[in-house]
Swiss-Prot record:
<feature type="domain" description="P-type 1">
    <location>
        <begin position="349"/>
        <end position="392"/>
    </location>
</feature>
<feature type="repeat" description="31; approximate">
    <location>
        <begin position="314"/>
        <end position="321"/>
    </location>
</feature>
<feature type="repeat" description="4">
    <location>
        <begin position="52"/>
        <end position="59"/>
    </location>
</feature>
<feature type="repeat" description="1">
    <location>
        <begin position="26"/>
        <end position="33"/>
    </location>
</feature>
<feature type="disulfide bond">
    <location>
        <begin position="408"/>
        <end position="423"/>
    </location>
</feature>
<keyword id="KW-0677">Repeat</keyword>
<feature type="repeat" description="24">
    <location>
        <begin position="246"/>
        <end position="255"/>
    </location>
</feature>
<feature type="region of interest" description="33 X approximate repeats of G-G(0,1)-[EV](0,1)-A-P-[A-P](1,3)-A-E">
    <location>
        <begin position="26"/>
        <end position="343"/>
    </location>
</feature>
<feature type="repeat" description="20">
    <location>
        <begin position="204"/>
        <end position="215"/>
    </location>
</feature>
<feature type="repeat" description="13">
    <location>
        <begin position="136"/>
        <end position="145"/>
    </location>
</feature>
<feature type="repeat" description="23">
    <location>
        <begin position="236"/>
        <end position="245"/>
    </location>
</feature>
<feature type="repeat" description="7">
    <location>
        <begin position="78"/>
        <end position="87"/>
    </location>
</feature>
<feature type="repeat" description="25">
    <location>
        <begin position="256"/>
        <end position="265"/>
    </location>
</feature>
<feature type="repeat" description="15">
    <location>
        <begin position="154"/>
        <end position="163"/>
    </location>
</feature>
<feature type="repeat" description="22">
    <location>
        <begin position="226"/>
        <end position="235"/>
    </location>
</feature>
<dbReference type="GO" id="GO:0008083">
    <property type="term" value="F:growth factor activity"/>
</dbReference>
<feature type="repeat" description="5">
    <location>
        <begin position="60"/>
        <end position="69"/>
    </location>
</feature>
């Protein structure tokens, strides 16, 4: 088409040159450019052309060539020529009959849409307008509904989904598409069949972060490489406590089983059962826990008796039935000191004296412990004298004849019990009172 137009214009140019040369040879001055030729002598002047029409050709001149099909008409006399369309672009539509020509688009503005075509969508507020296509390029096609727009020149294209990865499922009708994950983050896992998908964050909001740990608690540790992440707690349940440093995490309960209760504060956690053993059943409410391996079980209370209350933390155990209660510590002070142990036997000062004036308090072969248990003195350092003998206080107060003795105890009373009563004790004479006082 362009080749034909070029040939026609070239032929017209040759004819015009030949015509001008012929006029110059005939001696007739050529009319000025843009001026209509003078009418012949005695002839009527040529009518002026209507507005918007091309002027009639001069007599003998070649008529102005009609524009080719699809080409733009020549501009009116004194009018600005219509801008040529970009190479490869569609020509501007001709104005309707009697209508004003379409104004040229402002510099940098989008071209007017073709007749019958939908106008290009206006850019959103704050967005840059779509760039005009370069000369010789076709305009970029509008993206299909639901597809991402093509990247601008100089920008990196959106990354294609990795090979082996499944494409993201298309959102259901009426739902917003899932946001693309940030660079370096793993895509969110697809919900299991039958489960509701996680709600997408509102536009302009950051994705919901993981729940922060309670005040004073350590954050949940990240799972080690190759381990599965800890399951999220059910709605309304407290998260499982993180294991102490160096301890193994508690095993997850089997499917259908209830998780093991967390130990109370200050208690040791229950030991995990050995591999292959069944876990010990939890004690019923109100029952005592089972004893640890190697410990003796606590004696069960007799039927009808109330179980003994456990002592308070740091408190002293309650006394046995029938025993004397322990002395309570003084108010606000340190606990009362324990009573000094009662020294068995007389004091050392009571055992001094003339060895040859000792009164026998025992029998041949009596041991030191047996002698002191009777409240007597024992001294085996001197040979030939009494080793077990009465102390001086006993000689002064308890050397009574058997007929002067008054019973002060009971059968099989010990020397300690007798001395606590303030009585004398003498078991050296058989058949008389051993614990006595003077009549």
């Amino acid at each position: 088409m362009n080749h034909k137009l070029f040939c026609v214009h070239f032929l017209l140019l040759i004819l015009s040159v030949c015509y001008i040369q012929g006029q110059d040879a005939g001696g007739e001055p050529a009319p000025a450019e843009g001026v209509a030729p003078a009418p012949a002598e005695g002839g009527a002047p040529a009518p002026a052309p209507a507005e918007g029409e091309a002027p009639a050709p001069a007599e003998g001149g070649a008529p102005a060539p009609a524009p080719a099909e699809g080409a733009e008409p020549a501009p009116a006399d004194g009018g600005a020529p219509a801008p040529a369309p970009a190479e490869g672009g569609a020509p501007a539509p001709a104005p309707a009959e009697g209508g004003a020509p379409a104004p040229a688009p402002a510099e940098g503005g989008a071209p007017a849409p073709a007749e019958g075509g939908a106008p290009a969508p206006a850019p959103a507020e704050g967005e840059a307008p779509a760039p005009a296509p370069a000369e010789g390029e076709a305009p970029a096609p509008a993206p299909a509904e639901g597809e991402a727009p093509a990247p601008a020149e100089g920008e990196a294209p959106a990354p294609a989904p990795a090979e082996v990865e499944a494409p993201a499922p298309a959102p259901a009708e009426g739902e917003a598409p899932a946001p693309a994950p940030a660079e370096g983050e793993a895509p969110a896992p697809a919900p299991a069949e039958g489960e509701a998908p996680a709600p997408a964050p509102a536009e302009g909001e950051a994705p919901a972060p993981a729940p922060a740990p309670a005040e004073g608690e350590a954050p949940a540790p990240a799972p080690a490489e190759g381990e599965a992440p800890a399951p999220a707690p059910a709605e309304g349940e407290a998260p499982a406590p993180a294991p102490a440093e160096g301890e193994a995490p508690a095993p997850a309960p089997a499917e259908g089983e209830a998780p093991a209760p967390a130990p109370a504060e200050g208690e040791a956690p229950a030991p995990a059962p050995a591999e292959g053993e069944a876990p010990a059943p939890a004690p019923a409410e109100g029952e005592a826990p089972a004893p640890a391996e190697g410990e003796a079980p606590a004696p069960a209370p007799a039927e009808g008796e109330a179980p003994a209350p456990a002592p308070a933390e740091g408190g002293a155990p309650s006394p046995a039935e029938g025993g004397a209660p322990a002395a309570a510590p003084a108010e606000g002070g340190a606990p009362a000191p324990a009573p000094a142990p009662v020294e068995v036997g007389p004091k050392t000062e009571d055992c001094k004296g003339d060895p040859f004036k000792r009164t026998d308090c025992g029998y041949p072969g009596i041991t030191e412990g047996q002698c002191k248990a009777k409240g007597c003195c024992f001294d085996s350092s001197i040979v030939g004298v009494k080793w077990c003998f009465f102390p001086r206080t006993a000689r002064a107060q308890c050397l009574f004849s058997p007929g002067d003795r008054e019973d002060c105890g009971y059968s099989s009373i010990t020397p300690m019990e007798c001395m606590k009563r303030g009585c004398c004790f003498d078991a050296s004479i058989t058949g008389v009172k051993w614990c006595f006082h003077q009549k």
